[in-house]
Regions:
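Long, C-terminal catalytic modules of enzymes
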Residues: 1-15, 20-27
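Non-catalytic terminal extensions of PLP-dependent enzymes
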Residues: 4, 25-172
Length: 172
């Protein structure tokens, strides 16, 4: 510790994170931050409006930069869960949104598009979500078996949480 530069983390926060935030603010400037914020709100409201016909919308009002869906509207038997939707999104090349949060929304799916996403990407996401809703109505097995295009198929999340394997082992 004799040649240490000293403590990197204190009660004010982690220095590296604070530097990233400061760099972002200085790079964007006042006008850039306003534009990014406006675009984030616009993107979230656009997606919310596009998806509310196929997915439950527990809070149907203008949102900020994110919104929460409450599962599929037409899944009367409750067989298709939010986790199935998220896993199917992996097959379609999308990183799935946060699932099951907030806890007060049944089958919650928190969608938070970034401010840098172009409309084309948002429309592709909408098309994927609508396709998933259609698959839930017509052929639930596609969703219940997803993902099929990833290296790891469908792990048991409960078992994985209970018995963490934190080391990499090359396959047989």
């Amino acid at each position: 510790m004799e040649h240490s530069i000293g403590r990197m983390k204190d009660f004010q926060g982690h220095f590296g994170i604070l530097m990233r935030a400061l760099t972002y603010i200085l790079t964007m400037g006042s006008d850039g931050l306003k534009c990014a914020s406006t675009t984030a709100v616009l993107n979230a409201n656009y997606l919310q409006a596009q998806l509310k016909d196929d997915y439950n919308l527990p809070h149907d009002f203008i949102c900020k930069h994110e919104f929460v869906l409450g599962g599929l509207k037409d899944d009367c038997d409750g067989q298709v869960k939010t986790l199935d939707v998220a896993k199917r999104l992996l097959d379609m090349g999308f990183h799935p949104p946060t699932v099951y949060f907030p806890l007060i929304v049944h089958e919650a799916l928190m969608v938070e598009p970034t401010e840098t996403e172009p409309k084309q990407t948002l429309d592709e996401f909408v098309a994927a979500m609508k396709q998933i809703a259609q698959e839930a109505r017509e052929n639930k097995d596609i969703l219940l078996e997803a993902p099929i295009t990833t290296v790891v198929r469908r792990p048991d999340e409960t078992e994985a949480a209970k018995n963490l394997i934190l080391t990499f082992k090359k396959g047989e």
